[in-house]
Amino acid sequence: MIDETLLEAEEKMERAIEHAKEEFGAIRTGRANAAMFSKIIIDYYGSPTPLPQMASIGVPEPRMVIIKPYDNSQTNAMEKAIRDSDLGVNPNNEGNQLRILLPQMTEERRREMIKVARHKGEEAKVAVRNIRRKAKEELDRLVKAGEVGEDEGRRAEKELDDLTQRFVGVVDELIKHKEAELLEV
């Protein structure tokens, strides 16, 4: 029972970390990367579709992105969605593809992105702590019901705390790495 609860908590925490990594990948840094466009949604014949499912995204140079739509009739919709996004970029529509030159990030924009990264990191930490809280409630329920002894319950709680600390540490590392990436000129 205890092992199952701890294993389930660990799996959920790992999923929270994966989600945080995706969120951090979507934050724009000074360099171009395809993940920047993963959160852009385009209305594709009435259904909201993520940009990466509608086009191939290439990064031929550190500050250039080429987006080649699978359906050329959607090029204008993609251009508008990218322009309206919070990325702060202006795509050049070349008919069959979009060329995006990323401007050099200003110091102010870098600081703004660091705040966004810290906020996303805090959200990930809260998610990990919520998972811990739910697992602890389950452990307390098991002890109260008499399914496991109090000593075993305390040992499991300590394991859960260690697990939580480990995953919060991973989030801290992700934040530190993203800040360094953003401050790199």
Curated annotation (Swiss-Prot):
Gene3D superfamilies named in the record: 3.30.1360.40, Ribosome-recycling factor (1.10.132.20)
Record-linked Pfam families: RRF
InterPro entries per UniProt: Ribosome_recyc_fac (IPR002661), Ribosome_recyc_fac_dom (IPR023584), RRF_sf (IPR036191)
Gene Ontology molecular function, alphabetical: ribosomal large subunit binding
Keyword Cell division appears in the UniProt entry: no
Main location: cytoplasm
Entry keywords, A to Z: Cytoplasm, Protein biosynthesis
HAMAP family for the chain: RRF
Protein name per UniProt: Ribosome-recycling factor
Organism the protein comes from: Salinispora arenicola (strain CNS-205)
